Amino acid sequence: MRLMKSYKNLKEEVWDTNRCSGCGACVAVCPVNNLYFREESPVKFECDECSCIIVPADIVEHPISAEFCKTVVYDVPCGACYDACPRIKKSAIPKPKGLGNILKAVRAKASIEIKNAQNGGVVTAILANAFDEGLIDGAIVMMDDKWTLEPESYLALSKEDVLKSAGSKYLWKGPILKALKTAVMEKKLKKLAVVGTPCVINAIYQILSSDNDLLKPFREAIRLKIALFCFETYDYSKMIKKLNEDGIEPWEVKKMDIESGKLKITLINGNTVEYKLKDVESAMRNGCKVCGDFTGLTSDISVGNVGTEKGYSTVLIRNKWGEGFFKRAVYNGYITYDENVDLEAVEKLVELKKKRVKKD
């Protein structure tokens, strides 16, 4: 007999142990909207007119309960939030060695014009082709406000939407999977692509691996998982404070990359600012400290800038599903590629990230 889990089990195993990645999977799949992040709080003040008072939460990096979980209050079977989390004690996330399963590793770049592309623009090109061919009907990505750099979960519904959202800054202010509920439960999309850091893709893998009936609509809707190489992400407020202290305004930032143990920030005037990772460690999210996955081992395709020169992306095609999306984009002239990729450079960061987890 399956034990009934609730957000309280999730809180005990993940939230209270600083293991939460902030992906937002639990928030997205909760059928009664019981969970929320402080940044998305449904109540901004205390109300004296009713008994249902939700006091604004303290500053924490994990979700909070609005205290109307049906499992806790009425013993209604659910467990959706718990079963969607990739960081519970007994998750479905595999732990392969090194780079994991790879069918093919290539150096690639987009053949179409992409404004604000992160390096080779490969992810955007794959999604653009997929929209053109009707392979997907939506894509969950992150998009930032070019003035404030505030990131937000964005549901792209067309090729034009994807082109508009190109580029990533590795900042966190809200869960990337916030748009998942909108895509599946409101828009009723059936061919979704999800692009995110390894923690986000692990959450999707966890959902796809679950037999919880409440997660079935999400399992049936997700078609493609693309992971972005990630060493760590930063709390938006803390990083903006750091930039401001150094005389940098958010609107001046064009892109952010982690290269050779440094956070490299490229400004719109062409200048670059570099920080040693230890100098921005205070801005790193706590959940990143327990993550040893640099490339996104559970994805269909992993993409990053390590192992190739400027203007290109390293692409790790992990299965036949991912290969199909990549090859169709190549066939239709969206991407060019060759096999001149330095996997040793990628492996070094893979091992470095794993060592950091063991050290902590």
UniProtKB/Swiss-Prot annotation:
One of its GO terms (molecular function) is iron-sulfur cluster binding. Residues 11-40 form the 4Fe-4S ferredoxin-type domain. Disulfide bonds: none annotated. Pfam families: Fer4 (PF00037), FrhB_FdhB_C (PF04432), FrhB_FdhB_N (PF04422). The keyword Iron-sulfur applies. The keyword Iron-sulfur applies. Keywords: Iron, Iron-sulfur, Metal-binding. SUPFAM superfamilies: 4Fe-4S ferredoxins (SSF54862). Belongs to the FrhB family. This is Uncharacterized protein MJ1349. It comes from Methanocaldococcus jannaschii (strain ATCC 43067 / DSM 2661 / JAL-1 / JCM 10045 / NBRC 100440). The lineage of its organism: Archaea, Methanobacteriati, Methanobacteriota, Methanomada group, Methanococci.
